[in-house]
UniProtKB/Swiss-Prot annotation:
<keyword id="KW-0813">Transport</keyword>
<dbReference type="GO" id="GO:0015187">
    <property type="term" value="F:glycine transmembrane transporter activity"/>
</dbReference>
<feature type="transmembrane region" description="Helical; Name=4">
    <location>
        <begin position="211"/>
        <end position="234"/>
    </location>
</feature>
<keyword id="KW-0472">Membrane</keyword>
<dbReference type="InterPro" id="IPR023395">
    <property type="entry name" value="Mt_carrier_dom_sf"/>
</dbReference>
<dbReference type="GO" id="GO:0005739">
    <property type="term" value="C:mitochondrion"/>
</dbReference>
<dbReference type="InterPro" id="IPR018108">
    <property type="entry name" value="Mitochondrial_sb/sol_carrier"/>
</dbReference>
<comment type="similarity">
    <text>Belongs to the mitochondrial carrier (TC 2.A.29) family. SLC25A38 subfamily.</text>
</comment>
<protein>
    <recommendedName>
        <fullName>Mitochondrial glycine transporter</fullName>
    </recommendedName>
</protein>
<feature type="transmembrane region" description="Helical; Name=3">
    <location>
        <begin position="138"/>
        <end position="163"/>
    </location>
</feature>
<feature type="transmembrane region" description="Helical; Name=1">
    <location>
        <begin position="28"/>
        <end position="53"/>
    </location>
</feature>
<dbReference type="InterPro" id="IPR030847">
    <property type="entry name" value="Hem25/SLC25A38"/>
</dbReference>
<keyword id="KW-0677">Repeat</keyword>
<keyword id="KW-0999">Mitochondrion inner membrane</keyword>
<feature type="transmembrane region" description="Helical; Name=5">
    <location>
        <begin position="273"/>
        <end position="299"/>
    </location>
</feature>
<keyword id="KW-0496">Mitochondrion</keyword>
<keyword id="KW-0812">Transmembrane</keyword>
């Protein structure tokens, strides 16, 4: 994406319909609601992806799993939503914190740039968030995701193990205890109060951060690239395809009657632009970071000591399938990420612009 064009001075880096700036509460709540909706709706994609990626942790005699086989193992439809609670907690809290951190970084940097040069135009036609350069989008997304990703790492591991069928946790307590102890025999003892009345010794809180490096190696580049491509699609490419209603009306004499199918009012146009940009950006970045996701899942499901990204990578490449193992579950992740991004970013962008949110929190 090119640098923001120069134009007449713009007094506000971020403005709403009331001329005020959304505070942190608005971004936090809008992000949390967006994350909550997408997490509950798309949990089946995450569950099936996790089970496809865990396959080589089972015995070597087992037949290679497929999506069809995993679906047949499910006895009830609601089993597809196993792990929804930790997933919802992770996504809603994570999305709220991420959107808040990202918006604060972007607006603060935008205000700093305008304090140096008031002629810079940072206004976006479809969003109240400032329009930055490609490198600034990449950097802010990378840093914001790194901070929030590490904070929410314990919930991420609980979510991953709930989705797996290697750990049959029946409650959040069992999940937290099992990860803390990280020993299957001790996990079984916890489930039987007559054997063990509580969490015994030998546990470690470090277990809640297993796979942190792989997770951040996946999420930070993903987030940085995502913000970069999302802003590029939103501000530069898609507006060329979806015309502005005022532009269409002014040139209506030269347009055929069929062109009216592609004319949208400002609110609908911004929603379509934001959702389309989110889906395209998510699909691009998901494919690029797929190997890190496969490694992260394997690390968080194994109990082996001294596991590292390099060790797991070599092991996965030696297994049947070779390099294809690094892209196991990609189609499910593409589907989930694409739809999730379309839902969450559209909801987020529209909520922070809505009159209701403005009247309540501004």
């Amino acid at each position: 994406m090119s640098s923001p064009p120069l134009s007449s001075p713009v007094p506000q880096v971020k403005t709403t319909q009331n001329g005020k700036s959304p505070d942190a509460t608005v971004h936090l709540l809008a992000g949390a609601i967006a994350g909550l909706v997408s997490a509950v709706t798309l949990q089946p994609f995450d569950l099936l992806k996790t089970r496809l990626q865990q396959q080589q942790l089972t015995t070597k005699q087992e037949v290679r799993t497929t999506l069809t086989k995993e679906l047949k193992k499910l006895t009830r439809v609601k089993d597809l939503w196993r792990g929804t609670l930790p997933s919802t907690l992770r996504t809603s809290i994570g999305a709220g914190l991420y959107f808040t951190t990202l918006s604060k970084m972007r607006t603060s940097w935008g205000e700093y740039k305008q304090s140096k040069d008031s002629s810079i135009n940072l206004k976006s036609n479809s969003s109240i968030l400032p329009k930055l350069t490609a490198m600034e989008n990449l950097t802010t997304g990378f840093i914001a995701r790194g901070i929030v990703g590490y904070i929410t790492m314990p919930i991420t591991i609980i979510k991953t193990r709930f989705e797996s069928n290697l750990y049959n946790y029946n409650s959040m307590y069992e999940g937290i205890s099992g990860i803390y102890l990280d020993d299957k025999k001790q996990q079984q003892q916890i489930r039987n109060p007559s054997i063990n009345k509580g969490v015994g010794g030998g546990g470690s809180w470090k277990n809640f951060f297993k796979g942190s490096v792989a997770t951040l190696a996946r999420d930070c580049p993903y987030a940085g690239l995502y913000v970069l491509t999302y802003e590029a699609f939103k501000n530069d490419l898609i507006p060329l395809i979806i015309p502005n209603s005022s532009l269409s009306l002014s040139s209506s004499s030269s347009l055929s009657s069929s062109s009216s199918l592609f004319v949208f009012n400002d609110n609908n146009r911004s929603s379509i632009i934001n959702s389309t940009a989110a889906v395209l950006a998510a699909s691009t970045c998901t494919t690029i970071t797929a190997p890190f996701d496969a490694i992260k899942t394997r690390l968080q499901l194994t109990n082996e000591e001294g596991g590292s990204m390099t060790t797991v990578l070599k092991k996965m490449l030696r297994e049947d399938g070779g390099i294809k193992n690094l892209f196991r579950g990609l189609s499910l992740r593409l589907g989930r990420k694409g739809i999730s991004a379309g839902i969450s970013w559209c909801i987020y962008e529209e909520l922070i612009k809505s009159n209701y949110f403005q009247s309540k929190f501004l």
